[in-house]
């Protein structure tokens, strides 16, 4: 409990140039080695990981390493950096908001939806997460607190170019 299993395949196709992780294929959580190979499974570190449970996995084809799940404490925010995918678009410092990946816990959904490697606009709030550390890092930072009777000014470094409407 409180762990996930990272999987490294010892056989399969080569990972495409420019990528560091092998994409998910249908193989019943790595329990069907034949399906893994027939469905185009790639050799190396996998985006897919195993959650708590018992699995019948061929140790000659797959190496499984247990790691702790990630936690973001209360009053903290998780700053996400993705380690795989297409590079950020030129002139941007963070990847755009992507939906449907369950807070970066489904790397394949993130990549399929056009997610990019690097710093992300989206943050994660306090809680526990099944992050694949080969795919994502999460840096905890304190939430911004504005005291009563004060105001906060936000300066954004992401998003479309603004337009000066001041008339100057």
Feature names for model-found ranges:
Residues 1-168:
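Interfacial loop/beta elements and low-complexity acidic/Ser/Thr-rich segments
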